[in-house]
Swiss-Prot record:
Species this protein is from: Fusarium vanettenii (strain ATCC MYA-4622 / CBS 123669 / FGSC 9596 / NRRL 45880 / 77-13-4) (Fusarium solani subsp. pisi)
Biased composition (Acidic residues): 24-43, 52-74
Highest taxon above the source species: Eukaryota
Region (Disordered): 1-175, 210-240, 288-310
Name listed for the protein in its UniProt record: rRNA biogenesis protein RRP36
Annotated keywords: Coiled coil, Nucleus, Ribonucleoprotein, Ribosome biogenesis, rRNA processing
Main localization of the protein described in the UniProt heading: nucleus
Role, per record: Component of the 90S pre-ribosome involved in the maturation of rRNAs. Required for early cleavages of the pre-RNAs in the 40S ribosomal subunit maturation pathway.
Assembly: Associates with 90S and pre-40S pre-ribosomal particles.
Location(s) in or outside the cell: Nucleus, Nucleolus
Record carries keyword Nucleotide-binding: no
Amino acid sequence: MAFKRKSTALGLERRVRPRREDRWEEDPESQGSSSEDDDEVEEEGVRGQHNDEDEDEEGSDSEEGSEEEPEPEEQTPKVDLSSISFGALAKAQATLPSTSRRSKSSKTATESSRTETTPAPRKSTRSKDDPKPKRSSKHAPQEQTSKKPVSRRREILPDNRRQYRDPRFDPLVGKVDEEKASKAYAFLDEYREKEMSDLRAQIKKTKDTYAKEDMKRQLQAMESRKKARKRKEEEENLLKEHRKKEKELVAQGKTPFYLKRSEQKKQILVKRYEGMSKGQVDRAIERKRKKVAGKEKKELDWLQGARERG
């Protein structure tokens, strides 16, 4: 124990590893005043270090099995920071590790941990070469997957009304025979004629100009539809007669002759003018001439406007 006490008294003579310190230059004015304080702080720090080492040695001796009673530990002297100069404090702070370095190292550690913890992209568990589901037997229902994309179209307000359809004009029934349909609904022509006669009578009675103009437009539309039906019937009758003649010639061993569209129009005009008087034919030709002249005039006006714009 005497040896230990002697070592504490001669603690300044022991070798101490000097810490690596940065060079710090003091002001010439504060060098004289701070040198003594620095020496005192260094001496007290060395004494505290030696006391700590002695305490460690005592703990090791007690653990090895010595039955000696431990002596009361010497209290380390407390340093009064108010008596220390700023130069000494700055020097002591320079020896400590900087907080900026710690923060940078912590940032890099967090970034590396983030990169390590980022999950890898998911891979589809289903391979492209998966076999399609097969039926157990030909009588069993076929298995279908439920993982199908849902269509983006949505029926917001469903129409719950019953949808009616006419089976006569349904394509599922088959192709419509116009000749049979015209014969079956021939009575409609009488109804149309009656409607036209009623409209003519109303046009004569009404005094309202707007209503009269409306009824005149309706009558004109009905007459134009009637003329269109009549022209269509004439064309069909002409083709029927031509096919009948050609069949007879083919039976005699001659080659068939098919009418062109232009020939059909010529023969229709000839038949139409045959049933007219001379005055009716002249009026029909005059109307046709005016119609063609008006069409040509419109085309010329359009061409002149296009040239002026160009």
